[in-house]
């Protein structure tokens, strides 16, 4: 059920918005308060929601099978709705990858490990260093 909700949420992108605004699909999905700006707190909140969606056995860790499904779903969404894994979207994909999030290298990604990477993920995308992620961070040279 959670995966169906994630797939539905990912598919709800506004096509016209996505075509005209750099990073629109990402902003639409990660801007939790709808102000067009993403804070580190919103990144942390969304990462927590994503973790819960893919922790199918609810044991507090993403195992190899759960992370494989997460990788497949995320990459399909990026390809279909965000112009593919290039530019800033390559950074999004990298920051959600298992190797980025498995801090202790045990093959499992705990909620604590996943959540602890929120600030690093934010810093990767806040290219202009203004303390928020906006469409400006997705423009060439952002």
Predicted regions and their residues:
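Sec-dependent signal peptide recognition
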Residues: 1-9
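Calcium-binding acidic motifs and repeat modules
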Residues: 3, 17-142
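N-terminal signal peptide c-region/cleavage motif recognized by signal peptidases
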Residues: 13-15
